[in-house]
């Protein structure tokens, strides 16, 4: 099973991290607050983009459902 990474993004640094992980054998989930933020991210095979503001309950739900190996906070 591939490692699961959740990157909480919305910054240019987050987009750079996403590009850096393009060739890794991981399942990468990226959450951004807006559709505009999602549009700035280039598609890649191992990437799922979620465009919505996540409150604590939604974050907990995501963690329980996907069980990420690693969480990266690349927000402001």
Q: Across the structure, where does each feature detected by a protein language model lie?
A:
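A short, flexible N-terminal coil/short beta segment enriched in small residues
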Residues: 1-27
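Eukaryote-specific long, low-complexity intrinsically disordered regions
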Residues: 4, 39-41
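Short, flexible loop segments at the rims of nucleotide/cofactor-binding pockets, characterized by
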Residues: 6-7, 47-52, 76
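Structural motif
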Residues: 8, 31, 73-74
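Short, structured coil segments at secondary-structure junctions
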Residues: 24, 42-45
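Short, polar loop motifs at secondary-structure junctions
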Residues: 32-38
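Glycine-rich, highly charged phosphate/nucleotide-binding loops
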Residues: 44-64
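Glycine/small-residue-rich loop that forms an oxyanion/phosphate-binding "nest" at active or ligand-binding sites
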Residues: 60-76
């Amino acid at each position: 099973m591939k490692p699961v990474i959740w990157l909480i993004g919305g910054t240019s640094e987050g987009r750079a991290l996403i590009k850096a992980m393009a060739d890794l054998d991981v399942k990468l989930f990226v959450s951004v607050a807006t559709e505009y933020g999602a549009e700035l991210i280039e598609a890649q095979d191992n990437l799922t983009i979620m465009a919505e503001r996540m409150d604590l309950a939604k974050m907990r739900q995501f963690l329980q459902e996907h069980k990420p190996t690693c969480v990266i906070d690349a927000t402001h």
